[in-house]
Amino acid sequence: MLTDKENIFVVVTADKLQQDIKQKRGTEKLVFACNGVDYEHYQNIDKDFKFDEKFKKILDQKKPIIGYYGAFASWFDYDMVKYLAKTKQEYNIVLIGTKYDNSLEKSRIEDLENIYFLGTREYKILKNYAAKFDVCTVPFVINDITKATSPLKIFEYMALSKPIVTTAMDECKKYKSIFIANNNQEFVELVEKALKLNRAENLEYFETLRQEALENTWENKARKI
């Protein structure tokens, strides 16, 4: 099907995918457009939202919240997150999302007292939880899957105006607002650095977050396609 250059347009979301498609069928009717964000949706936070009891108890602890939402599968770096939790016991780590396999159970990540797995939350209310994160993360193992991944959530994090720390995925390296960690210790150090950012003293960083979010709205992606 991909070799049908006359009738098939191919849209790719990562450089690695673009390279693979070029080898198979050249550049004809090939469009690059990474993932994007509904900016307005993430700007409209419900300040009166009623959180569940588990999350309210986390908020009541008044500790920094390091957050992630998304899939939990073999590409999630459980060891990195556990290292952060053990090194920085003064942080709470909140994980929200769907289990794609049994990797979360096998990791025993929930054995750590400052790691909280909340399960799934509906898309329309997820933003209210993420708005309470102090730092947003994408701690993925670097492998063939993540080398070709444009994480949707990085643009949502940008729209929420949250400092972002990820592992060294090629698609994440493109953005000035993202702190890139190459190993467990760097992850800890960059989360700590991100926590210290504030609008009064780091206005340029938060403006970069806003601009990169606006550059990657779904409207802009649609125009490109």
Residues covered by each model-derived region:
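A short, active-site helix/loop in glycosyltransferases that binds the activated sugar's phosphate group
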Residues: E6-L30, H41
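Nucleotide-sugar-dependent
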Residues: K124-Y129, C136-M158, T166-S177
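A charged, aromatic-enriched C-terminal amphipathic alpha-helix characteristic of glycosyltransferases
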Residues: R199-I225
